[in-house]
Amino acid sequence: MGSLFRSFRRDAGATAPSVGATPAKKEPPPPPMTPLEKMLQDMGAIREDGSDKFFGMENYGNTCYCNSILQCLYYSVPFREAVINYPTRTPIESLTAALAETLRYPNPNAHLEAEAQAEKQKAANAQRPGAPPNQPQKPEDKDSPEYKKKMALQTFPLLETKNNAPSYGMSESLFTSLKDLFESVVGSQSRIGIVRPQHFLDVLRREHEMFRTAMHQDAHEFLNLLLNEVVANVEAEALKQPSLERSLPPAESSESVEHSGSSGSKTPNTTRWVHELFEGTLTSETQCLTCEKVSQRDEVFLDLSVDLEQHSSVTSCLRKFSAEEMLCERNKFHCDNCGGLQEAEKRMKIKRLPRILALHLKRFKYTEDLQRLQKLFHRVVYPYHLRLFNTTDDAEDPDRLYELYAVVVHIGGGPYHGHYVAIIKTQDRGWLLFDDEMVEPVDKNYVRNFFGDKPGLACAYVLFYQETTLEAVLREQEQENMDPALATTETNDSLKQNGFAQSPALGLVHSASQIPSHDEPHRLNSLKRAPTAPSLPTHYEHTDTNSAPSIPKPAMAPPVPPIPETHSMPLSPKKSDLQSRKERAKEEKERKAAEKERERQRRKEQEATRKEQEARARENQRREDAELKAALEASRASKADEDRRNQEGQKDRDPGRSGHGLSRLKRGSKSFSHRLSKDKDTRVPSSSNPGVPDPNSPPLNNTVVTSEHQEQEQQPPSDQQPGASRLSKKHNLNDEERDANKDPKQDKPGHGKWRSFSLRKKSLGILS
């Protein structure tokens, strides 16, 4: 028994650590696998073309515009092959030797050291005299993009590029730095990592002053500049090499051509590969409406910029791009056939289609009221496959089919700030999200979340389409529909910790976003340094829950990302509330500044409108005064004319006219005597004459004429009637009345009135 206890004590002493000895350290747990690492677990050997490399790019402060465009160009297979093969392809042995110096593997325990440092910092902050006691500290969200980027920098291989232009036989330029970048990724023995494009940025800032500042830059402008710089550098180097090409033997030259053709480039020294990939030809057709002659003018393009309309699509935008435009008024067309300015119709059509079509959606528009650029959040739908219809009749391959392979997304409220990310379709692994240092797989439907109508500030800005065939499209669709259950399982496994395509998680995040005091500040705060799409797309995917019926809901478990996001707020309410108040105060300040600016512009417009109305009122008043003055002048002139006519009427009634009347009476007396000779047998006393008017009653013209005519027929001869002289005068007046009845001037207004009045007056005078 004693020996048994001694052996047990001896064994216990051997196993128990001594007092002065240090305990053995446990192996540190490996860092958790990222969704990208899980996706690449079943991949085979590394390829030599670099199509299976998925490297992020470090952001040096507002360089996301450069990272997103470089990623899109790298995953364009023909462009990557052309860059690597010009002027010659660097041997893989040389690349491996160079990468041995530039590729650096970080400490695998760096994440543990970072966590320990964070704990020490937290303890130091708690021991400060000014720190409030027992204040809960907000734990770091391990599913946030910022944390993932930080961990990627600490755990992934870091690849730095150096100037290898002498090995290419070229001088250092933007093209050689781009070639260094692509060759470093292709020659790396690791599938994942982070590239440091510091050398590329140094060359870019050295040659172009506009990129030397840390200001927010435009990704489309950088794309256009980069393509033009590559063309210029390649053509400049080609001019230096004709003597070298002529010195090469014909056999060696043909051998180099065949080798380059097998590696993906047409010739090692060709300078047209950028034009063949990105360049297209636009034809401007102008038809004169006078002579109907059509004139054409061709121009090349490296990308197409299209205007946007609300609730439209890329197809409708292209249709508007090629719509007929009327050239009239001040914008008339000078027709050479007519020899002058004429009205015309103008339209733009595509004559030669590029192999890679870069579509720039013009999201930024200058507004007159704000006097600055403003972002348009219009809904513009872009398809996975596109066929252009606005081509000329003689276009080369007008039925070319394109497939979408990359989307550059702008996240932000305006053109002067924000963030760029790229969503790219890889050759074998589907769609990936490239957000600076972070690379994560996403679902195919995730690409549809940036039409511009979803909540948030993320919108598609540049679309990259590459040529494809109908057979390839059908083969891809068959592959997608071949085994939906297997595809669903793989998607759930690879995206379990990503949170992009999980409908239940999106519902949780979407419900949390309804709280304005927490979600809105976090969403706006993500734009400060490097806002990414993982938090924003969760809002977008919520509306696309029904768009993926192939994923069964029971097989999808709630992912990890939304859990810390929903529970992190109540863990540290004071700190989060303080941060929220600061952000809300900043947002309120910006909003008030914008409101003041809008109010100032509104007052300015109102003042301009008021001045315009006053000027218009003064002009109307002057016009009315002029019209009134003209009316008064016309009235005075008419009054003078009326007075002159009255005076002439008075002259007609003066004694001078009576003489004229007597002469007329004399002529009438002759006719009266002539009538008396015919009516000798007719004798009627004057007292019985019914035609004598009553002096007390005003006679009418017709009455006077009728009565006097009867009297004229019944009047006895002048030698038997004592008042023959009076009757003679009276019959002379009757002759005047008959002449007046025959005169057409009697129907004129005013003329007959005065004559009837004079006849009545004279008749009464004779009777009296």
Swiss-Prot record:
SUPFAM superfamilies recorded: Cysteine proteinases
Reactions catalysed according to its record: Thiol-dependent hydrolysis of ester, thioester, amide, peptide and isopeptide bonds formed by the C-terminal Gly of ubiquitin (a 76-residue protein attached to proteins as an intracellular targeting signal)
Domain of life: Eukaryota
Pro residues composition bias: residue spans: 551-564
Residue spans of biased composition, Basic and acidic residues class: 574-657, 732-750
GO CC term (a single one): nucleus
UniProtKB keywords: Coiled coil, Hydrolase, Protease, Thiol protease, Ubl conjugation pathway
CDD domains listed in its UniProt record: Peptidase_C19G
GO annotation (BP), single: ubiquitin-dependent protein catabolic process
Bias type Basic residues, positions: 663-675, 751-768
Record's compositionally biased regions (Low complexity): 713-722
Region (Disordered): 1-33, 114-146, 242-270, 515-768
MF-aspect GO terms: cysteine-type deubiquitinase activity
Coiled coil segments of this chain: 574-633
EC number: 3.4.19.12
Classification via Pfam families: UCH
USP domain span: 55-468
Presence of the UniProt keyword Cytoplasm in the record: no
Active-site residues, record numbering mapped to chain: 64 (nucleophile), 419 (proton acceptor)
Class of enzymatic activity (EC top level): hydrolase
Record note on quaternary structure: Interacts with creA, creC and qutD.
Function: Ubiquitin thioesterase component of the regulatory network controlling carbon source utilization through ubiquitination and deubiquitination involving creA, creB, creC, creD and acrB. Deubiquitinates the creA catabolic repressor and the quinate permease qutD. Also plays a role in response to carbon starvation and the control of extracellular proteases activity.
Family classification: Belongs to the peptidase C19 family.
Protein name: Probable ubiquitin carboxyl-terminal hydrolase creB
Organism in which the protein naturally occurs: Aspergillus terreus (strain NIH 2624 / FGSC A1156)
